[in-house]
Amino acid sequence: MDQSPFPDIAHQTASFSDGLVLDCGTTLQRLEVAYRTYGSLNAEKSNAILICHALTGDQYVAEPHPLTGKPGWWNALVGAGKPVDTDRFFVICANVLGGCMGSTGPRSRRDHGADEPWSIDFPAITVQDMVRAQKKLVDWLGIERLFAVVGGSMGGMQVLAWASLFPDRVFAAVPIATAPYHSAQNIAFHEVGRQAIYTDPDFHGGHYRTHGVIPARGLAVARMTAHITYLSEAALTRKFGRRLQRQNALAAPVFGERFAVESYLEHQGSSFVRRFDANSYLVITRAMDYFDLAADHGGSLSAAFRGTKTRFLLVSFSSDWLFPTAESRAMARALNQVAANVSFVEIVSDKGHDAFLLDEPDFHRTVAGFISGAAEAAGLQ
């Protein structure tokens, strides 16, 4: 019996019997894409915005999460009267291929019809595979062209892949706090997290569900390690400094009293294992590591966008050391080389990579302004 800390719950899904051919050469004979929508699709089906989530996100972008009860992960940006205005636009967000919130992934049953899940045997996927699965959903919804595709971090990678693979299907693209490839440093951090999962005694070679356990300790450490990269030193100092949980530190047993930042990271790890699957973490982090748009186009990033009519807004954050501003500037130069319509804005913030998820007024004004201008150019009322 599966003793996963989070139950299998019903999600809104679209099923595709024709499956999906993956970049690795494997064909998924059965594909399900879990998704949520907000707002109304207009009669012309021209007001759709696709939101692409990051590594540990899901489709519940603007509503309480069904497992945790927490507000939608991008409530700051998406909703009625917000920069991505659900009173004006039809907003779609899908759980990525390989995820664990309803879309086909390691928790899904194998193609041959057995009740056992894919688990660690789920095939390797790419960010482009994720986008092709999303395109099936968009086609199924009857939408010929998306007004915009918006996403941050890994979501931004998906935005870039959409604009490269299906330029005629995307009027505007907003890749945020992202890059056209995953750096060696980012791959290294991911590998530390993966090794923490692999070496957890409850991992069982990736078949932990058949043993009724999960590699909770390893997954928690992976989350803790990753979470450090999402913050800046200034943000950590402001929030925690060197504050101890209690003042009389040396009176505590063994190693003394813990620092507040330690407790914070432990909370991040322990709460994460209640809503995320370890095998999905392995699959998705590897997909991010494989992402390299230039390598896919003969080493030329500009070639990935040659002939595009999509208009772009690139956004970076000054204190983001996971996806630094230099990488967004490189994307802007590549787009300029093919005469693409591109704007680039660096938001000054000391909140690190996660600033794109937080209350950043300059960022919100930037996105709202771009979407308003793009809507006017697209003839949207």
From Swiss-Prot:
Signal peptide: none annotated. It is found in: Cytoplasm. It is an enzyme of class 2 (transferase). It catalyses: L-homoserine + acetyl-CoA = O-acetyl-L-homoserine + CoA. The keyword Transferase applies. The active site is at S153, D320, H353. GO terms for biological process: homoserine metabolic process; methionine biosynthetic process. Residues 47-359 form the AB hydrolase-1 domain. Gene3D superfamilies: 1.10.1740.110, alpha/beta hydrolase. InterPro entries: AB_hydrolase_1, AB_hydrolase_fold, HAT_MetX-like. Pathway: Amino-acid biosynthesis; L-methionine biosynthesis via de novo pathway; O-acetyl-L-homoserine from L-homoserine: step 1/1. Substrate binds at R223, D354. Keywords: Acyltransferase, Amino-acid biosynthesis, Cytoplasm, Methionine biosynthesis, Transferase. One of its GO terms (molecular function) is homoserine O-acetyltransferase activity. NCBIfam families: homoserO_Ac_trn (TIGR01392), PRK00175.1 (NF001209). Belongs to the AB hydrolase superfamily. MetX family. This is Homoserine O-acetyltransferase. The lineage of its organism: Bacteria, Pseudomonadati, Pseudomonadota, Alphaproteobacteria, Acetobacterales. The gene is metXA.
